[in-house]
Regions:
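Short acidic/glycine- and proline-prone juxtamembrane loop motifs at membrane-interface regions
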Residues: 55, 120, 126-133
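Transmembrane-helix motifs of polytopic, lipid-linked glycan transferases
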Residues: 81-102, 140
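Membrane-interface transmembrane helices that cradle and orient dolichyl/undecaprenyl
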Residues: 101-102, 141-159, 167
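Short hydrophobic/aromatic helix or loop-helix immediately within or flanking a transmembrane segment
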Residues: 35-36, 40, 50-72
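Start-transfer (signal-anchor) and selected internal transmembrane alpha helices
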Residues: 1-15, 147
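Helix-to-loop transition at the C-terminal end of transmembrane segments
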Residues: 12-32, 44-45
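Short helix- or helix-capping micro-motifs
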Residues: 7-8, 108-119, 143, 164-168
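Hydrophobic core segments of transmembrane alpha-helices in multi-pass, intramembrane catalytic enzymes
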Residues: 33, 87-90, 115, 130-142
Length: 169
């Protein structure tokens, strides 16, 4: 948990820094993600078809209600908060995976620190992009599979299979 807290603090500081410099929405795709999220409800033909054909839908589904407010749409603040939280979750999963593999708490914290200290990731998580959420979900999946393989979560695959019919459309 210390890794996640430190990642959240570093990510928040980076997000504030890049926002102050006016770089939070400088990437074209950052603005496009906000537009896709907003047009689900606010467009000439609103609907789920507006989610888009290029990107995976989860980030847009998470942002679709908050971006209806102009402050979140124009600044990307809610989507950036999701990115910062996602990188914190990814750092936690990295630390837990290294701790589980090596037995070293210092190694886990170091791995998370190296992950979070990457300047490219610090900038990326300071924008409303989809990659931080991808990193978080991937790292949690890898960590969960490692726990299952080690025998600490023997029912995990069965629970996933049983819940699958409940989440399909």
């Amino acid at each position: 948990m210390a890794a996640a807290a430190l990642a959240f603090l570093a990510g928040s500081a980076a997000a504030l820094y890049y926002s102050h410099l006016g770089l939070a929405l400088s990437h074209y795709d950052a603005r496009a993600h906000l537009v896709v999220s907003r047009r689900i409800f606010d467009s000439i033909v609103p609907g789920w078809q507006q989610i888009g054909a290029v990107w995976l839908p989860l980030p847009h589904l998470l942002d679709m209600l908050p971006v209806q407010l102009d402050i979140f749409y124009r600044t990307g603040a809610f989507a950036i908060a999701i990115s910062v939280a996602s990188m914190s979750v990814a750092a936690w999963a990295v630390a837990r995976l290294v701790l589980r593999t090596t037995g070293s708490a210092a190694g886990g914290l170091t791995a998370a620190a190296l992950f979070v200290a990457n300047p490219n990731l610090l900038y990326l998580q300071s924008t409303p992009m989809t990659e931080p959420l991808l990193f978080a979900t991937t790292m949690v999946a890898v960590m969960s599979v490692a726990e299952w393989v080690d025998g600490d979560a023997p029912r995990w695959p069965h629970a996933q299979v049983r819940s699958a019919p409940r989440i399909r459309p």
